[in-house]
Amino acid sequence: VISPKSFDPLRTRETFVIAMADATAALLVPPLLDRLQRDAPNATLRLRPLTTRDPLPLLENDELHLAVGHFPGAVADMILREMQEDRPDTFGHQEIYEGQYVCVMREGHPLGEAPVSLDDYCAARHLLVSYSGRPFGFVDEALATRQRTRRIVLTLNQFFTAANVVAQSDLLTILPLDFIPATGLAERLVWQPVPVALPAMRVDMVWH
């Protein structure tokens, strides 16, 4: 990673490689490009899809300059290292914003008129957004603490595609609330609180 002492943003021609999910990119990339054009006009960005909740190995191997996303385990590990003086940490992190996940479905869905009960949620058919392709997510982990499960009939790795699919089907999905306007489908979607407690959706940037 570039040393701050030698870095001149106005002169750099660096290509910065950043990993983030499409929902995060929809919110952050437009203002980031404006800032880059003003402060580092010769630099370029290369975005990679986010495929993991632990970007530290990719950063350590210099495959990325920066990762942006919800990394609770990785950030907790970095905080632990920072507290242990004999374990100097070569990673840095900063919270960008804290968001909220909601249960999203098409306009006119039978479950869209009121908050969804846990029983109705578990009985419904679901679309899972999974960066890594694994067939379960943090919602399923939260349900497991209540000895409950849900039926996932489709797994994919793009929030934009998820919004498009649920707008045309009876599937439910989980989306970041702040992302819904960026889909261009807000008028075709409705959303309700997720009927199981979830951790805060903290979005951090992490670097090496």
Where do the protein language model's features map onto the residues?
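A late-sequence structural motif
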Residues: 28, 107, 112-113, 118, ...
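A ligand-binding cleft/hinge motif common to bilobed small-molecule-binding domains
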Residues: 71-86, 141, 145, 159-189
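Short helix-loop hinge/linker segments at domain boundaries
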Residues: 1-19, 37-38, 88-93
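Short, well-ordered beta-strand segments
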Residues: 15-19, 67, 104, 127, ...
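Secondary-structure junction motif
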Residues: 70, 105, 111-118, 122-146
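Hydrophobic residues within well-ordered alpha-helices
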Residues: 59-60, 121, 164-169, 205
